[in-house]
Amino acid sequence: MQVGNILINAISDGTFIARPTYFGDHAAAGHYDLFDRHGQAWLPIGCFLVRSGTRCVLVDAGMGPSRMWDGDDEPCRLVGGQLPVALRALGVHRDDVTDVVCTHLHPDHVGWLFDLDSRPNFPHATIWFGQGDWRYFIDRDDPLIQEHIHHGFRGHAGDAHLRPIDRDTSVAPGITAIQAPGHTPGHLCVVVASDGQRALLLGDAITCPVQLDEPAWHSMGDVDPGLADRTRERLWRELEGDDVTGTGAHFPELKFGRVLGGSGKRWWT
């Protein structure tokens, strides 16, 4: 995806398998554009490499070399591991990454930040994330976060390369992290803008395009469902613009799209 002078490469670190129960009590498996005949949605674990001038910005760091696979009947299962290979295929070495923006600190977005010895996987990168997520996940020792990731954050607390933010912040030329709370307290989205064009990288603020038609569908991980609803609606409206396109970390095939509206109906295209 080219946005003016900025190049965005979509990368899948692995697979996120969701059942209807992941989206709450209102979800049904009848959405055959999302669920297969076994009632499972096969979604990517998305990351995005954004190159702007001399800056090489990774948005989200995947699941890492780990998995969440407690049983076939669980609402969701995740397995990662592909990000390093994908970066190499794009000609990018881990030393080349100048910034990592974590839309939030769920395990499928931070998994490659630190190696299993809690050392930074991207040694020259500034890591940006929401201050509210630090308080919620790291200060509280949330068991959802992988142990080596916890230790990595805590061991480098106060380091200049860890940048918690609590307001909209410019990360690099044409790349801005904006506040989008609800899914998690400090959830961020990323706006890429160049030459009058914009792209929104939504993280998990919107899990999949079906939620445009099914506003009652939540994500199992929403910390504040009411606030997550309001944030989703704000982002849907933002995506109605002629100059903007967007995608989320779990959108099928990580395809970019926009919202078309008319006659009281909205479509994702």
Give the predicted meaning of each segment.
Residues 13-14, 61-64, 105, 132-133, ...:
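Active-site metal-binding loops of divalent metal-dependent hydrolases
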Residues 110-120, 258-259:
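Metal-dependent catalytic neighborhoods of phosphoester/phosphodiester hydrolases
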Residues 57-59, 101, 127, 199-201, ...:
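Residue-level marker for buried hydrophobic side chains located in beta-strands
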Residues 2, 78-92, 96-108, 123-179, ...:
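Metallo-beta-lactamase
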Residues 76-81, 85, 195-269:
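Cap/insert and terminal regions of metallo-dependent hydrolase folds
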Residues 1-89, 189-208:
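Conserved beta-strand hairpin/beta-sheet module of binuclear metal-dependent hydrolase folds
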Residues 37-41, 178-183:
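Short Gly/Pro-enriched turn/cap motifs at secondary-structure boundaries
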